[in-house]
Amino acid sequence: MNKNKTKVSSDERIEGFEKHNEEVRRLWKDFEDGKPRRIPVQWSMSYKMFVLNPILNVEGYGFSDCFENPDVMLRAELEFEYWRRHNVWCDWEMGLPKNWDIGVHFQNVYESCWLGAPVHYSERQVPDVKPFLRTREEMKNFMAKGIPDPFAGFMAKVKNFYEHFLEKRNEGFTFKDVPLGNIGTPTGTDGPFTIAVNITGGEIVKMLYKDPEFAESFLWFIADALTERMKAWHKFVGIVFPYEGFVFADDCVQLLSPKAYAKFVLPLHKKIVETFCTGRPGIHLCGAVEQHLETLRDELHIRYLDTGFPMNLEKAREVLGEDVIIRGNLHVATLYEGPKQKIEKETLRIIGSSVTKGRKFIFGEGNNVAPNTPPENLNHAYQIAKHYGKYT
């Protein structure tokens, strides 16, 4: 009797996933056509949700294990994907997929490590890098060596992991009886200014004012290096560029005034966009970047902005207009800590604001869900947005 009850419950869950998935397909089609009936919801998260959650990660894998052993990275990513698809509701596909589409994912350190920064591992946090260019002389000597080989150094490891994943797929490897599908690679960028800040420990910010001419040459070197790496990897995996839908990031521009951004970083962004994007680009900026909104609108002509919790969404909509997609920005700490009453209040505040004008708003967190965030908190926010985020 108990077995039959469990079987029915399982069948009902699968049926619920299928119903949800069909609704989600219609929602995104309507959103693409400019006529969604409600506000879509997207959560941004990665396999750090698995690695840094001791309840899920019963083997106790650390990021150092994931970064040194491709089978551990593969396992961590698949465990995360399975958990996400069966526990965290939003407007994505739920349940088992036809194929596991995953990527070689070295978090946010691979570009800095490729340039020479050592990885720094923390027990309860995602990996970071140790700055290695602290002085003008070190930066100058670094540039004198020229742009690194796009497939050497840390990127050699990335390539090895990618080829290992492909080999596993070709061997017929399955997880939960589902085969591997598309294998993604790091063809994008976290942004030239952010990478420059990472590898110099922020010294480049001081250099902008102490020696602007040298700082500008250093930033161009970084941008050119990142661009060459991206071009090589696009070609390696067979992605033709430029293309529609290109998105990049550069979080550390929040440290700059509009004048400094326009002088030192905007030209780098334009070069990257011209190289990889047809049409209008998207950008992820999870800091306090309201001072750059007009420049992003008038100079980069963005079509999409992924925001962090400091962003005033109503201001963003006012400045960017109604034809730019904006995603955000329920505070990650609110989702992590709760209580549900606060989550509900903040969700209602956001979806009831003027950011929804033009029906080009995607509700989500600001930015990137913290490990150990209770799924019930995420699901509560989703249900509130789904119920009250309907357009009339």
Label every PLM stretch briefly.
Residues 88-108, 135, 177-185, 239, ...:
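Extended interaction regions within the primary functional domain
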Residues 100, 108, 121, 333, ...:
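Basic, gly/Ser/Thr/Pro-rich low-complexity segments located predominantly at protein N termini
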Residues 118-138, 246-255, 327-329:
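Aromatic- and acidic-residue-enriched carbohydrate-binding clefts of CAZyme catalytic domains
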Residues 73, 77-80, 138, 157, ...:
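Generic hydrophobic, aliphatic-rich segments that mediate packing or membrane embedding
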Residues 1-59, 63-66, 144-392:
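Active-site loop segments of alpha/beta catalytic cores
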Residues 63-117:
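Membrane helical hairpin/interfacial module
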